[in-house]
Structure formats: C-alpha cells, structure tokens
Amino acid sequence: MAVVAHLFHELRGETWPARLNTAERAGIDLVMLDADLAGCVTTWLSNGGSLDARRLGILCRKLSDLEQVLPELDEADNPGLWRLWHEMTRLIVDTGPYPTN
C-alpha cells in the first residue's frame, strides 16, 4: 500500500496538459480514464488497500485501457502521468485478495 500511496503522491505533482481535456487515444476518453482511475485508487487507499468487486472490475478494465493508450501517447500528452497510473493500477490489481461479493 505504501508504494501506491507514494506513486499517487508523485502523480499529484504531474501537470495535466490542457490538450487532454477533449482528447482520446486509442478511442478512449482520457478525462474519463483519469477520473475513473482516480476514484478507484483513492478508494483503495482510503479503504486500507481493498476494493469492492465493482470497483475492482472497473480497475481491471481501466488497466486494459491504459495498455491501449500508452503506446499512442506523445510527449505533449505527459506520458509520465499515464505510466504512474499504469503502475498503481497494476499493483492494485496484482495485489488481491479479490472480493467475493
């Protein structure tokens, strides 16, 4: 949990490029991707490292979205921000345990 908290703190120092406010990469709306990731990660952190089944499902889908988006980014898209999201999401999804509800 400490690693994700550290990465999230690092992410908060990243700049959101204004050009992403209406951008899609690989057909994925980046504002919505960022918002969904933020909601799931902050909930995971607030809950001491656990997510309900619905949010875990969302996070798994967002991990797949990130893996499609990352190769499409250029430097003006601040790929460092998206790599941080990817690392946090992967760590949370890989951590388990998975909820039964």
Task: Identify the residue ranges that each predicted region occupies.
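Hydrophobic alpha-helical segments that drive targeting, anchoring, or assembly
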Residues: L59-R83
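Amphipathic alpha-helical interaction modules
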Residues: G13-L63
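Exposed alpha-helical structural elements
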Residues: V3-L7, R54, I58, D65, ...
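Short, extreme N-terminal segment that most often corresponds to the first beta-strand
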Residues: M1-W16
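Secondary-structure edge/capping motif, primarily at the C-terminal ends of alpha-helices
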Residues: W44-L51, L66-D74, G96-T100
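Amphipathic alpha-helical binding modules
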Residues: D74-N101
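Intrinsically disordered, low-complexity regions enriched in Ser/Pro/Gly/Gln/His and often acidic
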Residues: H9, L37, E75-N78
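Short, hydrophobic/amphipathic alpha-helical patches that form generic packing surfaces
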Residues: L33-W44, Q68, L84-L91
